[in-house]
């Protein structure tokens, strides 16, 4: 394989290209086992929607071994740039972590990110010393603008959050990947490991998955399967795919094939 192939985000080096979310799991035990099976090193948590520390019982941060994972608080549930900035600041105060997965989503039906609000919040948070990983639609112009303000990655969606519809934005993703100066992490909508493999084959640097694992019949098994899909996709990208052709091309050489008489033609 490719032992020196690593992912660098915000000055930190990772060997796994699979990020995992912590929502929707039936309990913390299943979540922990899925994280372990996935081999992930970056774990995202929704600051507005969970009890990070819960007096009298185990909270989410208590359930995570933070010596093993880079915590990535996210601003899920924030509808405006101002809300997202406020939640990011609260997350840093609560966790001591200056990483943030920036989500500004005013649309409750399709959960599509607001490009203007995202860029506005990103500029503020980068200026305050955050390592910002913004969730966006696959828009190459927006991606470059986020790079310019100092975002550590860009995270274009594959399809709507939680839909499991797979990589429906492939052509647009290619425009984001073309000339990208920061890691591109495909986020949202991936349903099965082959979706993750497809994203990595296209040149994405990593993927983030949550619902596809948490809602699987066997979340731990699916987490392991996604890890293998990511590894396969990345290995295929590095190996370089064959050129596509519009016509058939025989895999066996014609040279050296004996010229046999046509049985329909009398000798």
Swiss-Prot record:
Coiled coil (UniProt feature) = none
- The protein's assembly and partners: Homotetramer. Forms heterodimers with either ThiH or ThiS.
- What is the name of the protein in this document? Thiazole synthase
An example Gene Ontology CC term for this record:
cytoplasm
Q: Where is this region: Disordered?
A: 247-267
Q: Where does 1-deoxy-D-xylulose 5-phosphate bind?
A: 162, 188-189, 210-211
Single GO BP term: thiamine diphosphate biosynthetic process
Q: In which pathway does it act?
A: Cofactor biosynthesis; thiamine diphosphate biosynthesis
CDD domains assigned: ThiG
InterPro entries documented for this protein: Aldolase_TIM (IPR013785), Thiazole_synthase_ThiG (IPR033983), ThiG (IPR008867)
Q: Which organism is it from?
A: Deinococcus geothermalis (strain DSM 11300 / CIP 105573 / AG-3a)
**A Pfam family matched by this chain, by name?**
ThiG
